[in-house]
Amino acid sequence: MRAAPERLGLLFAVACAVNGAFVPAVAKLTTGRADALLVAALSNACAGLAALLVLGLRRQLAPLVAPQLAPSLLLISALGTALAHLCFYLGASRTSAIVATLCLQVEPVYALLLSWMALGHRPTPRRLAATALLLAGIALALGASAFETSTGVWLLLFTPLCWQLSHLVVLRRLVGTPAVVLSGARYLYGGAMLLALWAVSGTASPPAAELTAMLPLLAVQGTVLGLGGTLLWYEAIARLDLTRATAIVVPLIPLLSLAASFALLGEVATPRQWLGLGLTAFGILVFVTGPAAETRSA
């Protein structure tokens, strides 16, 4: 009886999308006031402290240092938090929130390829066609000049690959590990990695008064948008196949993100961006309405 778990997985996926819709706009707000590396380090440190508190209350700290789990937990922390968030915040600081939103839509392509190569989920012709539509939409929305001149665009395009690689590690090495442990490890270890990188980078921080004023927003960014979103995501992929979960979450985020970008930043998408986003959303809709991925036989 898979109906009930799938319905619950869909609910977690939608909640993850709503949460994620605010990520680009808030990232643009914070990186506009402080260095991107500092924002990444402090927001993830806040998430790490929250994760430590949650795991302590649940008496689940032991798995973080268990010999059979710790290497894989460190790996997903390096990929899915430290590297991904470094690329994301650096990219967001160099582009608009709308461009950041558009770039992240490439994630289903990575999910499709990794699910096929590593998990044996063969792509159907329908999903291949959807991938072509999705990529065409992103290219149309961004335009050729963005790929040629913007380092931020390339950093943002690389970010979802880091996330998908970390998800793959979870599915291959950490099956059965509670979502709260996975999320806690990602932000504890990943936050520590980013703090260490910031400490040795010599990056200047804003004046103490300004930094203090930013801390509440950084805390929300790390704990709610970061840790909360990760918890929701792991609950979703525990009940849905990776490509399907990605294809549900990713199309909802840009539509809601455009509203968040307008509300928080006053950014308005151009007609070209709307057209590209529409094509991308249609491509992902083809993903969502298609059959679940097939697993190759041994």
Q: What are the language-model segments listed below?
A:
Residues 10-14, 67-76, 123-134, 153-156, ...:
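Cytoplasmic-side transmembrane-helix entry/capping segments in multi-pass membrane proteins
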Residues 15-18, 40-42, 85, 99-106, ...:
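Helix-helix packing/entry segments at the starts of transmembrane helices
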Residues 19-26, 58-98, 104, 138-140, ...:
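Specific transmembrane alpha-helical segments of multi-pass solute transporters/efflux pumps
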Residues 51, 114, 123-143, 194, ...:
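Hydrophobic transmembrane alpha-helices of multi-pass small-molecule transport proteins
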